[in-house]
A protein has these predicted regions:
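Catalytic-site beta-strand/loop segments enriched in glycine and acidic/polar residues
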Residues: 148-177
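Soluble, non-transmembrane catalytic domains of enzymes that act on hydrophobic metabolites at membranes
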Residues: 1-10, 62-76, 94-96, 106, ...
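Catalytic core of membrane glycerolipid acyltransferases/transacylases, capturing the structured
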Residues: 37-53, 65-67, 78-136
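A transmembrane-helix-recognition feature enriched in membrane-embedded lipid enzymes
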Residues: 7-74, 121-125
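A cross-family acyltransferase "interaction/gating" segment
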Residues: 118-121, 134, 167-249, 261-271
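Residue-level preference for the first positions of well-ordered beta-strands
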Residues: 83-85, 152-158, 186
């Protein structure tokens, strides 16, 4: 190959990448616009936590998964619609559209997201609850979640309180599980992993390290198709549980369940 041929190939590759990103960004803008249309068309902001609104949240999450080239696949029994406090392992901001595609729930998110342009307003209109990490605000949020559960409003949060590479479940923080005990509603564990086309845990989907959100979005827009595998465990009856005993059971079942999910969907299952 001559130098001229090499230069031409590089230019074509750059142009192809530019066109691909342009289409993805265009699809993303369209999806966000559709999300705002749904919020205002159905006036979701007036009753953002009405359980009926979860169908709109699910629709929007599925649109986002299409934009980000994520196929959502449920392993085992699908999620029920009965009220519960939902918990899941946490890998990326992509967890929200992935989980929201498979389950009709409202999400708990860090308070900073409420201030994000566009995304914050859309999340608030979609019934997201916001919590200030590391502050006394968690007591207020726990009470608010308990009140929602008593009204049969499903809420999902990430008890690890941080993201991981998806290989294992970190130590969970169980304070908010007290909402399930107070409301006497079960705990529903959801587990997920992102698998690439080689049958391995995807390395692009995890939002970890020092990368900024905008940088990670650009990486995600360029990534090949990824499958988000979801697994819903049998619900945990909170009757007779203390906060400590419930936290321990949730921790153990999340770790065991994620390992079993890996064994099921990965070509070369992880050790441990």
């Amino acid at each position: 190959m001559t130098q001229q041929d090499l230069t031409t190939a590089v230019k074509k590759k750059g142009l192809s990448r530019f066109i691909h990103l342009g289409k993805k960004l265009g699809n993303g803008v369209t999806a966000v616009g559709q999300g705002f249309y749904v919020v205002y068309r159905h006036q979701l902001y007036k009753q953002p936590n009405n359980p009926e609104n979860t169908r709109y949240v699910q629709w929007f999450c599925r649109r986002l998964c299409d934009v980000f080239n994520i196929e959502v696949r449920i392993e085992g029994e699908p999620a029920g619609h009965e009220p519960a406090l939902w918990v899941s392992n946490h890998i990326s901001w992509l967890d929200i559209p992935a989980l929201g595609s498979g389950a009709r729930v409202f999400f708990l998110a860090k308070a900073e997201i409420e201030q994000w342009p566009i995304v914050g307003k859309l999340a608030k209109g979609g019934g997201t609850l916001f919590i200030k990490r590391g502050s006394g605000d968690s007591l207020r949020i726990r009470q608010q979640i308990a009140d929602f559960l008593k009204q049969n409003i499903p809420v999902l949060f990430f008890p690890e309180a941080t993201t991981s590479d998806g290989q294992e479940v970190k130590r969970i923080h169980g304070r908010l599980l007290g909402a399930a005990i107070e409301a006497q509603q079960p705990v529903q564990i959801a587990l997920l992993c992102y698998v690439n086309q080689h049958g391995e845990l995807d390395q692009i989907a995890p939002y970890i390290g020092e990368m900024s959100f905008s940088e990670h979005v650009m990486h995600v827009l360029e990534m090949p198709r990824v499958t988000a595998h979801l697994r819903f465990l049998p619900r945990i009856d909170v009757t007779g549980h203390t906060l400590d005993s419930l936290t321990h059971e949730v921790q153990q079942k999340m770790r065991t369940g994620l390992h079993e999910l890996h064994q099921q969907v990965l070509h070369h299952a992880l050790d441990g």
